[in-house]
Structures are given as C-alpha cells and as structure tokens.
Amino acid sequence: ATSFGVPLKSEKVMDVRRAVESPAEGTVSGYVVKTGSNEYKAKTVLFATGSHHRKLGAPGEEKLENKGVSYCALCDGAFFKGKVMSVVGGGDSAAKEALLLSEHASKVHVFVRGDELKAEPVNSDRVKAKVEEGKIEVHYNTEVAEIMGENSVEKVKLKSGEEMEMGAIFIAIGQIPLSDLAANLGVELNDRKEIKINRKSETNVPGLYSAGDVTDTQFKQAITGSAEAVTASFWAFDYVGRNKVVFE
C-alpha cells in the first residue's frame, strides 16, 4: 500500500459516526473516524477489529502463553507432536480442537466444567470414536485451577487437587469480538456479538464492511481474513463509484 502512496496511521480509533444524519436524496453519507488525536473523513469503512480469546484466568496462563498455553490448535498443535495435550472447554470449538490435536498428541485430555460436551452431533460422534481408540479422554465436572511449569507447560492442577503432567494446554472457551464501534452505527451482530457479513464482506449498513475474526465467518485464520478484506476492498470501490458520498 505504501508503494502507491497510501499513508499508514498508527492511532487508536475512539469513534466512527455518520457525517450526515439525513443526506439529500440521491446522496449517501460518508463517515467520520475519530482517533485520540485526529478526525478522518471516509467514504467507506472496513472494520477489521479482530477479537480477543476468552482467557481461563488460571494462575500460570499468562506466564506460559506461547510456551505451551495456546488458543489455537490449528496454529500450534503440531509444535507439540507426540506430547500429552489438553483442551479446556465444553462446546463445539473444544470438540474440534481436541479432534485436531488427536492427530498430533499421544493423548488428549478434555476438561469440561459441566456434565456434557455440547458439540455438534458429527463432532460428538467423532470424539466418542477417539475416546474408544484411547486417543481422547473427556473429564466432566472438572476445572483447571493452575497451569504449572517454569519455561514451558509441565503440569496442570485441577480444582480437585489432582496434578497431571501435560505438554500443552489449549483454551477453547470462546472469543470476544471487538465489535462495539460497528454496533454503535447500527451494524447487525449475531448472538456471539460477531459482525454479520455477506459474500461481499458487506454489513447491513451501506458503506460499512468487515473482515477477519470480528465477523461471523466460520474460519478464523489470517489468510481467510485477508481474503475477506480484499473482497471488501473491491466492493467498497464499486460502492464509491455508484454513489455520491457527502460529508455535509
């Protein structure tokens, strides 16, 4: 982008608002992006604000992050090949993480806080098959109290007091999308507060687009987010060409 003269700004966005609340017939409102130190006019806005992985909050989690504590089996599972691994979570994401890790781990322990693994039927059946093979073990009504190790994950301590040797632990208890800026403009969210987009990466609000982990798309990978952003860019260019955007 910089080779074409596009300026890059490293500023925290505080607010995005419509420039004109009631634009004249035949025109559409542009947007004003407010940062901590400036305001910028924009004919379209792409929200690529991402999401935060929901943290477990156990002692040792922060210290050992990227040292055996991970939030993405697809990203990091292969680094711990042959080791005993664990997954914390009780939903479909946890089931899918465990299944993926079972291809790399000597064994996968799944710690479920409740009394049921609430996975999609197909994934539930696949987990049961792996349990029968001895590749996965599911521990119900079980919570991790502490993640232990000096320079890497070595053990997990359960709230029951039991300690288990572990080479890696994957936290799969959900994500927190950073969608508030978009929501304030009337952008539609799903029940997980992810931004709803269509195949053009458009939101329900004209001129507003979204891409990456903040969206309701299934796969949360850098390459898929990049593809969504490219798609949004094409359609934003088309939008600007078809509409007269005004700021007053």
Describe each model-derived feature in a short phrase.
Residues 1-35, 39-42, 103-199, 240-248:
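A Rossmann-like FAD-binding core segment of flavoenzymes
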Residues 94-95:
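N-terminal Rossmann-fold NAD(P) dinucleotide-binding loop
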Residues 52, 57, 62-79, 173-219, ...:
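FAD-site-proximal beta/loop scaffold in flavoenzymes
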Residues 68, 83-84, 107:
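Residues that mark the start of a beta-strand
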Residues 89-91:
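Glycine-rich Rossmann-fold phosphate-binding loop(s) that bind the pyrophosphate
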